[in-house]
Regions:
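Short leucine-rich amphipathic alpha-helices used at interfaces
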Residues: 1-2, 76
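Helix-adjacent hinge/juxtasegments
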Residues: 57-99
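Short, contiguous alpha-helical
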Residues: 2-66, 108-160
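Carboxylate-rich helix-loop segments that flank metal/cofactor sites and access channels
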Residues: 96-111
Length: 160
């Protein structure tokens, strides 16, 4: 899923780059407001989850401020690429034992301590990406941008 996530994030950045700053930041009725706001929220969420899963520094921004996590488009693109590369390297080192462990943290969203199997947390992180990329895809389509295929079986390194 890390490879798929990286592939899709690259494609989405290329698609979003066709828009100007005003179009990227335009309110579009999505939960995180704009295309760029939704993308920033996803980057923020990856950093939150990786702080729990692999000891990364947690973002200082709170959930409600996550749409502004990275406001500059060039900085966003750089951080997204670095983040995806780090997640890919981390995922390659996971073992069955790692996946079988529980992960405990305080969830601000749930308002309590959580203990969940690490494998479920990892699936959630990638599922969260897919959920919001679907929203971004819909916003891009509404803005007249043709989006690339998102089917997992079409990922280039899976297609023979």
């Amino acid at each position: 899923m890390a490879r798929y996530n990286r592939w899709q994030n690259r494609a989405m950045m290329e698609e979003v780059a066709r828009l100007g700053a005003v179009e990227r930041m335009a309110p579009r009725g999505a939960h995180w407001g704009s295309i760029q706001g939704t993308m920033a929220h996803l980057l923020w969420a990856d950093h939150v989850w990786m702080s729990r899963l692999d000891g990364w520094e947690a973002p200082h921004a709170r959930l409600e401020d996550s749409a502004g996590f990275v406001a500059d488009w060039s900085e966003y693109r750089s951080k997204r690429q670095i983040t995806d590369a780090r997640i890919s390297r981390w995922s390659q080192g996971l073992s069955e034992a790692d996946l079988a462990e529980d992960l405990s943290w305080y969830s601000g969203t749930a308002g309590r301590e959580m203990t969940v199997p690490r494998a479920i947390c990892i699936v959630h992180m990638f599922n969260h990406q897919t959920h919001h990329r679907g929203q971004i895809s819909a916003m891009l389509t509404a803005a007249g941008v043709l989006t690339a295929p998102t089917d997992l079986f079409l990922m280039p390194d899976l297609v023979g």
